[in-house]
Amino acid sequence: MRINTLSLFSLVSLVPTLALASLSGSVGPLTSASTKAATKTCNVLDYGAKADKTTDLGPPLASAFADCKSGGLVYVPSGDYALSTWAKLSGGKAWALQIDGTIYRTGTDGGNMIFIEHSSDFELFSSTSSGAMQGLGYEYHKDNKWSGPRLLRLYDVTDFSVHDFILVDAPAFHFSLDTCTNGEVYNMAIRGGNHGGLDGVDVWSTNVWIHDIEVTNKDECVTVKSPSKNILVENIYCNWSGGCGMGSLGKDTDISDITYRNIYTWNSNNMMFIKSNGGSGSATNLLFENFIGHGNAYSFDIDSYWASMSSQGGNGVELSNITLRNWKGTEENGASRGPIKIVCPDGAPCYDITIEDFAMWTEDSSRQRQWYSCRNAYGTGFCLKSGSNHVAYEATTTTVSSAPSGYSAATMAADLKTDFGITASIPIPTIPTSFYPGATPYSALMANKGSTAKVRAVVAPSKPTTVAAATSTPAEQQTSTSTPAPAVEQPSQQSPGQSAGEVGGCPFGNGRSVPTGPPRAGHRHHQRHGHH
């Protein structure tokens, strides 16, 4: 779907409590998948693919892409496919990749199983919300091998979306967004092994909206890396994960205007972890709002001397203009690992940090106390020092023995009771319909055509979307008008090329507005793992 920004005047007049968006402009593909499919549909079955879990999908997928790369839709129908040679799909324009089947890794090369690069106006999706990649990473991990392939990588892709898709058990990372622009990623489930180095979503890009995603692993949940600008991360369910973070940050770090909102973290290493060791550059204008956590080792953690990362030299990465707002819940052991730990570089103290409405408490009934610790950090709240003379200082720690008011927070019914280990096949999950307590996903799953999705208050008025009947053949796609629609989606049949912004996913059409946010003026024992 295409998301369009509104003017600041419109935002302020319609929703006074919201300020300028973290995003800098429109995100998503320029044309719908049905339009692409009507131009041309390239079904991999017509290029030699077989849904027999044995025949290599790689060559048929590459051939189908070659025929549709200049405008069209590449279609992988339902069924089980083997991928033994990786697919590098480069130079596409106005194209879509619809994967309704399950792709199983059968090859052993490194690199990326599906690598999409130098493309524009692109969409990857499953019309059934059940298309998946199964990496079978346990076949590596049970032998303590961690250098296998990644599942999905986008590089230098503009005006794109990835949605209604499932990634399971990567031998290495699951999903990377590398130097991409104007993208939207949503309605996904990512499930990996319980070990470091099996990242969920890594993003170093510009103007990208990531929302409504569940991640299970033991490393990065959704993590921003450098360089990145104008990234909005919302409605994220870190369900037995490593947790969200930024980094590792090193030399010439360039990160700004990042918002994390509505982040639910269960039984993970941390709720938000900003990690570095030396380095240079800066990360500024960061908002971490509406976080709920339970059973996590760390809550908010800035570690500028992270021991799992080799020193990068330099005075350190300068962190500034950071706001934490509305954090609730519990941590595993507040006496050992307090909910606020901020360690900034001696050579580049952090400043303009604001911590407000932060209430968390320990789950350790035998030691009813917790601490807050700050070093070289300036701002307002808890252990932060005030003042404009930002000089280095030794850590100051405050210990409290009574629970703060208002710390109690909701849990999620789907909170996992155990991890998936690293020695057995991990089952393919279904994409959930809830990612944060009380928050409705922005877009209904494509499999739930008649369901309702939440509409932000900021939406351009328009007539309802007109939906034409879909046919059952891949080449004859349905059409729809590209106007914003009311909250209730219109039901329709599923067919190749039917995509968000039409009838299957987002009910808003191409006039949907950007959500807004204030512009800030290892294992069960929680072992940390170093990589990147």
UniProtKB/Swiss-Prot annotation:
Keyword Membrane listed: no
Keyword tags: Carbohydrate metabolism, Cell wall biogenesis/degradation, Disulfide bond, Glycoprotein, Glycosidase, Hydrolase, Polysaccharide degradation, Secreted, Signal
A GO term, aspect molecular function: rhamnogalacturonan alpha-L-rhamnopyranosyl-(1->4)-alpha-D-galactopyranosyluronide lyase activity
Protein name per UniProt: Probable rhamnogalacturonase B
SUPFAM superfamilies the UniProt entry points to: Pectin lyase-like
Annotated segments matching region Disordered: 466-532
One Pfam short name: Glyco_hydro_28
Organism (species): Aspergillus oryzae (strain ATCC 42149 / RIB 40)
Enzyme class: hydrolase
GO CC annotation terms, alphabetical: extracellular region
Record EC number: 3.2.1.171
Signal peptide (UniProt feature, chain positions): 1-21
UniProt record, GO biological process: cell wall organization; pectin catabolic process
Ranges annotated as biased composition (Low complexity): 466-475, 490-499
Primary localization class, coarse: secreted
Known role: Pectinolytic enzymes consist of four classes of enzymes: pectine lyase, polygalacturonase, pectin methylesterase and rhamnogalacturonase. Hydrolyzes alpha-D-galacturonopyranosyl-(1,2)-alpha-L-rhamnopyranosyl linkages in the backbone of the hairy regions of pectins.
Gene coding for it: rhgB
Cellular localisation: Secreted
